[in-house]
């Protein structure tokens, strides 16, 4: 840093809570404090981890357990210099980055290219400089000449590469072998000096594509094969020339390696061993491709080389807006932990034969109609059932571009696709005849055949349009699929032989797929016949209901546009609907709350609602809560009956398994949950249920269909995250705020983020929220259908919306609006308004007294005599009055429990303040002490005002006076270490505060068995105590297996209250 620290914009780091790991430059800390950043004492509480050492265990814990961004101190310095918080992505200190440990010197490149290379190297963990010195590990130079080049040749420690090395490392996300990128391997053509001949040169270069190579990159492979000049890509002159003739390219026929750089979104997943072949393979002939559009983050300014940038602009017109937003989001400060996000399919492709991997990728995005065949074959033949098959999201804007790319790849990869249009149509007709004539297979059904049927049904249009979409992707650009014949080099001939072998394998695979498709079709036909019969019965029932509804609601049909509509997926054509929908799908019906013709006041939005409550009274330990519900319902115009009767309009219940629920459904009453009631209270309007949590669950209260699952969540915040926690609890699953290898499911809002990356790496299934909602509503098949594409689609408009066929019977009662009589409306309309005015008049007097209004203290005491006081167990208004009196007497409110001398409480409560203060305060007194001090205008002796709570002391079997005496003699947890698992309740920060006030220390890293035994056997080392909870027991499996005690939170909570160590009462068995 410079001697004079830069000026920090006011409150620049106001939202930053940082935790420093290792030695950090004091000036960096000063900059953070000057920008109003807050330092926290535990990494779980931080928003940013700052460290130079990426291999520190605390850094790994912050990344993997707490999902926190880790940045180098340079992030602080550069953010100050730029005047804004920079994205954290490019400042990771971790050693897994591509260019970690590399210091590159840039020479003989244009300023524009230098900026691009500099940004790429530093973004991926390296350093750049313009001076060639001892620190340099690499010299990046486009031509084998110059002083720096000659100097670097004499030093074995410096590796000399062309700029292509940087680009290839980034695009393939791995550090490439520098030996193949030495600039002396470039072969040059004679440069034309006359400007008049530029056009002729361009034509010659274009013609050379037909004779030899289209590879412009200055790689050894291209130079050995007689490619054009290697410095064209980084020469400003040649860039200008080339942009005229070559930027207009056709993706469907361009198989050159430049396409890989132009789009920056394709990179090989499986590469041949021969480096030369690898460098020269045309794009469309790569054995396996992974979409990595989000992997190469854009960097500020004109970072990409001119040619790449120009081609990106040409190709970018066809890119979907969502891909652009993903790339922009990589630099957005709001995206905390976006690293190299891979396509949903990359883990699937790791251990597959190359032909299967390629089929998976090439068919995943545009050819959704083939997903069932491919997925079926993968699950049957490649053990892919342990991972997810997820489609790439395709928007109409990119569909044409991707079709062209896929058509070319399919032309080269699939022999069955390498046919003329007439042959394809004939082949399809034969397939259709074979399928229609195929009898029901005699062999046992494939274990995933049922899955495939449901998958087909879950995607309308998909099965019926296969025969239409299949040829379109071949025939769309037929004239563009055949480029002029290129000259085959020796290694290309070898590759051609390999490709023929791949084609034979693929042909066999496609035959297997056809056989499986026939099997699926026959099973599908049987299911369709059953569905048609069910639909006919359903329609008859619906017609009767419609007639009843029309007779009841005819006067109000003109005003139905004001009513709430429940969103139902768009209707399919009748023929498709019969063949595809898994359950009978009725016509779209409008859902009503109140009669839309009647205006219901907000304060009485439950007018006309008569509630009965089932299930909840048995579940509630606090009966006062039930009384509160009844009071709130009545305050908003509703009534509550003690039992379910025919006059009830709503049944508030948790489960569909009860006699009250069965009766309510028979009588077409509205069955909803307390969560629905909470939602309508917020909206001040009775709306139909529209979330899975609004409907009673399909199993008895306390049923646990997901008892074997440990669920984590990513992408959901605030109320959505709370809803998922509740859904996991109702399903009987364990919920963890962190992600570890023991988690069985990750529920994602979007396929992004560190948790998503880790889940893919650890083979943890990633699903949408609909998966959990379906289980709650009775689709228990979802437990084994976790890999279905319907649960791995993350572009849902509302992921919490219920699946329609699971709630048809529950929505039936909402198709008839609730009527409110005019008399009831008039009798209720006025009183609530009067009450509202009364409340408005009273409200100002009940506001809190502000601290600013407190008069200055009349007495000034020395620090030794000044009481530092905390209050617990009082209403806020009462606390403000006490604080006023305390200030007048010259006392202070303690900043924390550690600095507290007096705790004022009216009874023993297990609040954080009480449990932290009991270990450190001198006195715990009643409010009467403060009142008496104020009356005497001085602080008096506390002995006569010591808190005594006989009821609590009997309940917890302790004496508060004795506990205080023990705490004064010696801290309870002195010389004791605690490891507390992250999902503990109360929170980890609360437990840490309680332990530290009692003299203990909390370990940030989970101790190994060896470390535990070392501390246990060596009396000179501190004891380590393990604290966990039910949801975190999977983290303690090793401890249980080796007979090590693990305690629950009461070991700490009750321990500090009684000031005793009880090693027996709170152990997990």
From Swiss-Prot:
GO terms for cellular component: chromosome; histone methyltransferase complex; MLL3/4 complex; nuclear matrix; nucleoplasm; nucleus. The modification Phosphoserine is found at residues 227, 235. Residues 94-183 are annotated as: Interaction with PAGR1. Keywords: Chromosome, DNA damage, DNA recombination, DNA repair, Nucleus, Phosphoprotein, Repeat, Transcription, Transcription regulation. Residues 590-1069 are annotated as: Interaction with TP53BP1. GO terms for biological process: adipose tissue development; chorion development; chromatin remodeling; DNA damage response, signal transduction by p53 class mediator; DNA recombination; DNA repair; endothelial cell migration; negative regulation of DNA-binding transcription factor activity. Residues 553-564 have a biased composition (Polar residues). The keyword Transcription applies. It is found in: Nucleus matrix; Chromosome. Residues 188-208 have a biased composition (Acidic residues). SUPFAM superfamilies: BRCT domain (SSF52113). It holds the Pfam family BRCT_2. Residues 188-271, 428-494, 543-592 are annotated as: Disordered. Signal peptide: none annotated. A motif (Nuclear localization signal) lies at residues 702-719. PROSITE patterns: BRCT (PS50172). Involved in DNA damage response and in transcriptional regulation through histone methyltransferase (HMT) complexes. Plays a role in early development. In DNA damage response is required for cell survival after ionizing radiation. In vitro shown to be involved in the homologous recombination mechanism for the repair of double-strand breaks (DSBs). Its localization to DNA damage foci requires RNF8 and UBE2N. This is PAX-interacting protein 1. It comes from Homo sapiens (Human). The gene is PAXIP1.
């Amino acid at each position: 840093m410079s001697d004079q620290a830069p000026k920090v914009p006011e409150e620049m780091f106001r939202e930053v809570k940082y935790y420093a790991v290792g030695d950090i430059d004091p000036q960096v800390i000063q900059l953070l404090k000057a920008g109003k950043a807050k330092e926290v004492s535990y990494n779980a509480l931080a928003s940013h981890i700052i460290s130079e050492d990426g291999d520190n265990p605390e850094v790994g814990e912050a990344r993997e357990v707490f999902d926190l961004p880790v940045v180098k101190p340079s992030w602080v310095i550069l953010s100050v210099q730029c005047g804004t918080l920079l994205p954290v992505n490019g400042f990771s200190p971790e050693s897994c980055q591509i260019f970690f440990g590399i210091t590159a010197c840039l020479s003989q490149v244009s300023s524009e290219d230098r900026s691009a290379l500099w940004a790429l190297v530093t973004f991926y963990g390296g350093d750049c400089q313009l001076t060639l010195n001892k620190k340099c590990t690499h010299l990046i130079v486009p031509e084998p000449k110059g002083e720096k080049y000659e100097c670097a040749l004499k030093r074995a420690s410096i590796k000399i590469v062309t700029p292509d090395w940087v680009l290839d490392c980034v695009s393939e996300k791995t550090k490439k072998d520098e030996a193949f990128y030495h600039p002396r391997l470039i072969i040059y053509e004679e440069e034309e000096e006359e400007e008049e001949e530029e056009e002729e040169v361009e034509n010659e270069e274009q013609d050379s594509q037909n004779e030899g190579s289209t590879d412009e990159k200055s790689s050894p492979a291209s130079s050995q094969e007689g490619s054009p000049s290697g410095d064209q890509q980084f020469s400003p002159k040649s860039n200008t020339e080339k942009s005229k003739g070559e930027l207009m390219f056709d993706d469907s026929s361009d198989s050159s390696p430049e396409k890989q750089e132009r789009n920056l979104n394709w990179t090989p997943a499986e590469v041949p061993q021969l480096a030369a072949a690898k460098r020269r393979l045309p794009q469309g002939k790569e054995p396996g491709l992974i979409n990595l559009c989000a992997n190469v983050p854009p960097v500020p300014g004109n970072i990409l080389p001119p040619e790449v940038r120009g081609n990106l602009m040409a190709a970018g017109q066809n890119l979907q807006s969502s891909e652009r937003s993903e790339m922009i989001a990589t630099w957005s400060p709001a995206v905390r932990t976006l690293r190299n996000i891979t396509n949903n399919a990359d883990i699937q492709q790791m251990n597959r034969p190359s032909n299967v991997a390629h089929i998976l990728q090439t068919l995943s995005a545009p050819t959704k109609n083939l997903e069932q065949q491919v997925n079926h074959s993968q699950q049957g033949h490649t053990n892919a059932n342990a991972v997810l098959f997820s489609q790439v999201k395709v928007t109409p804007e990119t569909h044409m571009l991707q079709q062209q790319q896929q058509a070319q790849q399919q032309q080269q990869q699939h022999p069955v696709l390498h046919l003329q249009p007439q042959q394809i149509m004939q082949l399809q007709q034969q397939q259709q005849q074979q399928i229609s004539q195929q009898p029901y297979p005699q062999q046992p059904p494939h274990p995933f055949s049922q899955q495939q049927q449901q998958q087909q049904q879950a995607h309308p249009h998909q099965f019926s349009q296969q025969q239409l979409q299949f040829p379109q992707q071949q025939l769309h650009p037929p004239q563009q699929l055949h480029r002029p014949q290129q000259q085959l080099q020796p290694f290309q001939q070898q590759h051609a032989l390999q490709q023929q072998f791949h084609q034979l394998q693929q042909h066999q695979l496609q035959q297997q797929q056809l056989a499986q498709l026939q099997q699926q079709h026959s099973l599908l036909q049987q299911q369709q016949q059953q569905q048609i019969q069910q639909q006919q019965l359903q329609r008859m029932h619906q017609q009767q209901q419609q007639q009843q509804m029309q007779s009841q609601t005819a006067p109000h049909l003109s005003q139905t546009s004001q009513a709430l509509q429940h969103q139902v997926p768009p209707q399919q054509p009748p023929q498709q609907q019969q063949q595809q929908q898994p359950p009978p799908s009725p016509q779209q019906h409008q859902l009503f709350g109140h009669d839309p013709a009647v205006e219901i006041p907000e304060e009485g939005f439950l007018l006309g609602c008569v509630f009965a409550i089932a299930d909840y009274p048995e579940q509630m330990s606090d009966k006062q809560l039930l009384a509160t519900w009844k009071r709130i319902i009545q305050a908003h115009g509703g009534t509550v009956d003690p039992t379910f009767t025919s006059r009830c309009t709503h049944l508030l219940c948790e489960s569909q398994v009860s006699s009250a629920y069965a009766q309510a459904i028979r009588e077409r009453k509205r069955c909803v949950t307390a969560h629905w009631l909470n939602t309508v209270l917020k909206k001040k309007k009775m709306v139909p249920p529209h979330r899975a949590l609004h409907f009673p669950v399909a199993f008895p209260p306390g049923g646990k269909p997901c008892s074997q699952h440990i669920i984590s969540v990513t992408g959901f915040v605030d109320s959505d995250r709370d809803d998922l926690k509740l859904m996991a609890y109702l399903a009987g699953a364990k919920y963890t705020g962190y992600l570890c290898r023991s988690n069985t499911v990750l529920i994602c809002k979007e396929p992004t983020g560190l948790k998503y990356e880790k889940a893919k790496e650890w083979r943890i299934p990633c699903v949408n929220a609909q998966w959990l909602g379906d289980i709650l509503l009775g689709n228990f098949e979802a437990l084994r259908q976790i890999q279905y594409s319907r649960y791995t689609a993350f572009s849902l408009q509302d992921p919490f919306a219920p699946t329609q066929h699971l709630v048809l019977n529950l929505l039936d009662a909402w198709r008839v609006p609730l009527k409110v009589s005019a008399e009831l409306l008039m009798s209720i309309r006025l009183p609530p308004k009067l009450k509202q005015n009364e409340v408005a008049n009273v409200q100002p007097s009940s506001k809190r007294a502000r601290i600013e209004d407190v008069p200055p203290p009349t007495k000034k005491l020395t620090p030794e005599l000044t009481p530092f006081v905390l209050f617990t167990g009082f209403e806020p208004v009462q606390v403000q009055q006490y604080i006023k009196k305390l200030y007048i007497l010259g006392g202070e409110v303690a900043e924390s429990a550690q600095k507290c001398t007096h705790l004022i409480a009216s009874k023993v409560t297990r609040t954080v303040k009480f449990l932290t203060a009991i270990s450190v305060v001198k006195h715990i007194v009643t409010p009467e002490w403060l009142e008496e001090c104020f009356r005497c205008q001085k602080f008096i002796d506390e002995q006569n005002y010591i808190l005594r709570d006989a009821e609590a002391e009997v309940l917890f079997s302790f004496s508060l006076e004795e506990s205080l005496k023990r705490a004064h003699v010696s801290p309870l947890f002195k010389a004791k270490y605690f490891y507390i698992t992250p999902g503990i309740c109360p929170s980890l920060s609360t437990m840490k505060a309680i332990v530290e006030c009692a003299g203990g220390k909390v370990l940030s890293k989970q101790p190994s068995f060896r470390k535990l035994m070392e501390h246990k056997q060596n009396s000179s080392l501190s004891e380590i105590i393990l604290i966990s909870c039910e949801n975190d027991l999977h983290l303690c499996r090793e401890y249980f297996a080796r007979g090590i005690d693990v305690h629950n939170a009461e070991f700490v909570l009750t321990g500090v209250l009684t000031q005793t160590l009880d090693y027996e009462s709170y152990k997990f068995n």
